[in-house]
From Swiss-Prot:
Phylogenetic classification of the source organism: Eukaryota, Viridiplantae, Streptophyta, Embryophyta, Tracheophyta
Protein name according to UniProt: Ethylene-responsive transcription factor WRI1
General function of this protein: May be involved in the regulation of gene expression by stress factors and by components of stress signal transduction pathways. Transcriptional activator involved in the activation of a subset of sugar-responsive genes and the control of carbon flow from sucrose import to oil accumulation in developing seeds. Binds to the GCC-box pathogenesis-related promoter element. Promotes sugar uptake and seed oil accumulation by glycolysis. Required for embryo development, seed germination and, indirectly, for seedling establishment. Negative regulator of the ABA-mediated germination inhibition.
Coiled-coil features, chain-numbered ranges: none
Gene: WRI1
Compositional bias of kind Low complexity: 1-26
Localization in the cell: Nucleus
Entries under Gene3D superfamilies matching the protein: AP2/ERF domain
Region (Disordered): 1-66, 260-297, 398-422
């Protein structure tokens, strides 16, 4: 720029020839580097044409001979990639993105992984590394799941997967005890469901498969063939495949019959025990009745013996006949004066003078029957029974010389050793 300014100053001079020479020389200097730029463009264009042609010698520079496989320059592993044209790359704002399929130790394993992913994306008509007939079994399995689930299963089989994670789906090594644990995600709104720990990866993978079929149906992604779990699922009451209504009803009837038979087999011994238990009570009741009858007979015999003993005592020693005394000072019923309540009446000054006192005057000239009823009014309602028997009265005729119809018996006890109570009974003879 400084040179151009100097040239402009020089052009102001009256000589016009000098200015014309400077203007003609500047474009010549600026056009000198242009051929170099053209050479760079020519070098880049043929290299781009060669990259599109797989048969060109430039293709020999690729890290792998298989389609979709490249070798990592640092790790040395072979990585499988897939270009998904149908997806939209939001980062670069363009259509299509690269899908990572995992890193493998062998080049052939990475090539097989690419073929499986290509079959899932574009079908059997796409270009593969190996013939499509080698993937007949995998074609059936991949049709049950989505693209994302199948790609995740392919990545798990790669050797470059995170350490501690098994090659089987839903299986990982426990960080404490080193055993293999199984988990399944997105069950009942939870992040994952813990299925337990196992000694081998295969056992944990089978546990995951069972849970996946139970919660996600027959179309769930499993580590092994679903036919290996049909018997186990039936025992749990899980039927992964659709069943006809007729066959389903027959199966229900068969299961119901089996349940009834098992219940009957369990209830038969119980019924026998119940019958034995029911047969035993009548024998016990008969024995109890016999014992009661024997007790009653023994009580009756005891009562009869007690009555005989009482009668013998009364007839022999306990009967005391109260005869009338010739003394006018005593009455025939003076046994009543034995009570302490009548002791004041027995002490009289006339007794010292030997003057007889007529005691009936003390009772206001009342008859004997009225007085005796008044005295024994409280005890007249008590009945004598065999249990409370203290005294038994034996009536006998009064002697002809006595004018009073009363005969009284008194005893202190039914036996000389058992009781000490006093009881009185009177018998009127008309």
């Amino acid at each position: 720029m400084k040179k151009r300014l100097t040239t402009s100053t020089c052009s102001s001079s009256p000589s016009s020839s000098v200015s014309s020479s400077t203007t003609t020389s500047s474009p010549i200097q600026s056009e000198a580097p242009r051929p170099k730029r053209a050479k760079r463009a020519k070098k880049s264009s043929p290299s781009g044409d060669k990259s599109h042609n797989p048969t060109s010698p430039a293709s020999t520079r690729r890290s792998s001979i298989y389609r979709g496989v490249t070798r990592h320059r640092w790790t040395g592993r072979f990585e499988a990639h897939l270009w998904d044209k149908s997806s939209w790359n939001s980062i670069q704002n363009k259509k299509g993105k690269q899908v990572y399929l995992g890193a493998y130790d062998s080049e052939e394993a990475a090539a097989h992984t690419y073929d499986l992913a290509a079959l899932k994306y574009w079908g059997p008509d796409t270009i593969l590394n190996f013939p499509a007939e080698t993937y007949t079994k995998e074609l059936e399995e991949m049709q049950r799941v989505t693209k994302e689930e199948y790609l995740a299963s392919l990545r798990r089989q790669s050797s470059g997967f995170s350490r501690g994670v098994s090659k089987y789906r839903g299986v990982a090594r426990h960080h404490h005890n080193g055993r293999w644990e199984a988990r399944i995600g997105r069950v009942f709104g939870n992040k994952y469901l813990y299925l337990g720990t196992y000694n081998t990866q295969e056992e944990a993978a089978a546990a995951y498969d069972m849970a996946a079929i139970e919660y996600r149906g027959a179309n769930a992604v499993t580590n092994f063939d679903i036919s290996n779990y049909i018997d186990r699922l039936k025992k749990k009451g899980v039927f992964p495949f659709p069943v006809n209504q007729a066959n389903h009803q027959e199966g229900i009837l068969v299961e119901a019959k089996q349940e009834v038979e098992t219940r009957e087999a369990k209830e038969e011994p119980r019924e026998e025990v119940k019958q034995q238990y029911v047969e035993e009570p009548p024998q016990e009741e008969e024995e109890k009745e016999e014992e009661k009858a024997e007790q009653q007979e023994a009580e009756i015999v005891g009562y009869s013996e007690e009555a005989a003993v009482v009668n013998c005592c009364i007839d022999s020693s306990t009967i005391m006949e109260m005869d009338r005394c010739g003394d006018n000072n005593e009455l025939a019923w003076n046994f009543c004066m034995m009570d302490t309540g009548f002791s004041p009446f027995l002490t009289d000054q006339n007794l010292a003078n030997e003057n007889p006192i007529e005691y009936p005057e003390l009772f206001n000239e009342l008859a004997f029957e009225d007085n005796i009823d008044f005295m024994f009014d409280d005890g007249k309602h008590e009945c004598l029974n065999l249990e409370n028997l203290d005294c038994c009265v034996v009536g006998r005729e009064s002697p002809p010389s006595s004018s009073s119809p009363l005969s009284c018996l008194s005893t202190d006890s039914a036996s000389s050793t058992t009781t000490t109570t006093t009881s009185v009974s009177c018998n009127y003879l008309v």
